[in-house]
Amino acid sequence: MFFSDHGGVQWLVVFLGNPGLKYQNTRHNAGFLTADVVEKDCGVRIDRLRFHALTSQAELGGQKVLLMKPQTFMNNSGEAVAPAAKFYKVPPEHILVVSD
């Protein structure tokens, strides 16, 4: 189930990839490719620009989750993840990263 309210989230799910056509269908974009499957299968759009990332909120298993596709290169993904984790007060053990 997906929601649109602005309440807190308990988990961050971060789909890592690199911007640009050079990496579009490579293993370096495994996280982005996984996010595309999640969007299709769950009917969610990860398209709200926030925290240097495309984001969407979802409720999965009764837990509020922020889905993130950082719009930085993988090596700089902390620029997106750290502010989101701080804003929502999500501890590191509640951050799931999907990458190659």
For each predicted feature, which ranges?
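Nucleotide and nucleotide-moiety/phosphate-recognizing core
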Residues: 1-99
